[in-house]
């Protein structure tokens, strides 16, 4: 049998620019078990690593359906598993055409470290991407079927830039039992209402 478990928790206090203190606590647990009754052949493929922000759930998952998208920005579209409902890619529309054209407009799809890419925009050095950073007003969440929504419009106030490792190999197993992605690391974001959610590096099999 193959078994995998993961627990994540975060707690702390954050002081906002207007002097308010927000106490936060967040956690989730994941588990996977498969009884292997016959030999399983896993398709080896390249992993692409975009950041995913979970607006309506605590952790990212993948569906057994796919969409076409040039995740590695090589001019050829790749077949990728769809994010489960409630999760979105964190995106930056660099050419302002109201579309996400390829993986260069996501975080981590090319470098493999989306949190490090995002940290380059932390102008005030407070370890958050928030209203004190000029990129905040340009960041969006994105799903192919829904298009772009500004992070401020969906209630995201700040994204913490220091993730912890949360390795989980079996994300979105398809009907053949093949993993469609790997969870690498997790951090948190603060909502405008004072609650928190998760941001994760999710490696997709292309």
Where are these regions (language model features)?
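Type III/flagellar secretion export determinants
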Residues: 1-206
